[in-house]
Amino acid sequence: IACWLHDVGKVVVPESILLKPGPLDATETQIMQEHPVIGEQICAPLKSLRPILPLIRHHHEKMDGSGYPDGLRGDAIPLNARILQVADIYDALTTDRPYRVALPHNEALSILFAEAENGWLDSAVVSKFALVSKGHDYFPVRGRTMLASYYA
């Protein structure tokens, strides 16, 4: 369930930021970086979702403490949040974005390993992800879904 809901806080982020074809400015970055906390707040009232609140909140933390929203480092980041983070980054890399086309599986894996080497991702999680995805270079490169289809 956390995989489906981890970015629910983005419902308050303007589409102009989500679909911006270039780098975000400081204000836009701040707005974007609020989505984990907002997602946690959206899900908190639902008792059945309380076990996944730490995953929603911490899926953008980095092993070296440079992530957000709380600057957690290393094992202070829940393991399931570290796993979700790797899956989320892989998904982002292999999906078309307004600023670039989707990357193939092997290129995405190379980036994940580089981010682990830089101290941002859990290297053990990246290694396990690479192991379970080995031989699966048939993973489709996916296009993006128009956000408008998610708005009521």
Residues covered by each model-derived region:
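Metal-dependent catalytic cores of enzymes that make or break cyclic nucleotides
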Residues: 1-152
